[in-house]
């Protein structure tokens, strides 16, 4: 991320004027939509680690679009998602009911459709099943009624593991790679169950937001 402390706002449509949004629509811009939650990530990571990660992914993809001369915008991040994990027991973990998430996401997609955008791609960095099922329900129901279509990225190697058949029209298949190979990680035996706020997420946050670790 750039050093600008307001980038979580200015890198998205929140830093654009309405005329810039209109021009992006005319350019057939793709919408990148970061989603996540605000939840406890141990004493060493910020509550917003998931949304910082998904927003960083969107920012990096936007740079690729810019370099290729293609238009895209980043929607304001949605971070009041759901969690059923034990992080609910910690101060600072916000969680929403599935129906609340579905309704909120559908209304956001309806707005993007009303602006005139044609395609939206989600970027999710939170693995809780409540979150994923709510997002997918919102995508499926929105795709049935909106002109704009939304897509959920999934690594090819994880498609069946994540419960997909592989032929879903909203599924955006992306090439798999060893995530942990993206960072220099030294693991201890107790890190083998590296799911939440452990070696990988810590390395990731050191890479994108070092001042927060």
Predicted regions located by residue number:
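Extended, histidine- and acidic-residue-enriched regions that form the cofactor-binding/catalytic faces
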Residues: 1-121, 125-213
């Amino acid at each position: 991320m750039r050093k600008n402390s307001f980038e979580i706002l200015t890198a998205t449509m929140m830093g654009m004027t309405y005329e810039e949004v209109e021009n992006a629509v005319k350019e057939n811009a793709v919408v990148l939509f970061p989603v996540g939650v605000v939840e406890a990530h141990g004493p060493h990571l910020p509550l917003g680690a998931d949304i910082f990660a998904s927003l960083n992914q969107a920012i990096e993809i936007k740079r690729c679009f810019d370099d290729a001369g293609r238009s895209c915008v980043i929607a304001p991040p949605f971070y009041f998602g759901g969690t059923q994990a034990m992080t609910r027991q910690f101060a600072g973990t916000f969680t929403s009911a599935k129906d609340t998430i579905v309704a909120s996401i559908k209304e956001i997609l309806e707005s993007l459709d009303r602006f005139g955008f044609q395609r939206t791609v989600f970027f999710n960095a939170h693995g809780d099943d409540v979150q994923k099922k709510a997002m997918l329900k919102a995508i499926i129901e929105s795709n049935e009624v909106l002109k704009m279509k939304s897509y959920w990225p999934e690594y090819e190697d994880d498609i069946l593991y994540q419960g997909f058949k592989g032929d879903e029209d909203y599924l955006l298949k992306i090439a798999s790679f060893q995530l942990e190979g993206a960072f220099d990680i030294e693991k201890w035996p107790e890190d083998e169950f590296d799911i939440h706020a452990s070696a990988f997420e810590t390395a990731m946050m050191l890479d994108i937001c070092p001042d927060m670790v």
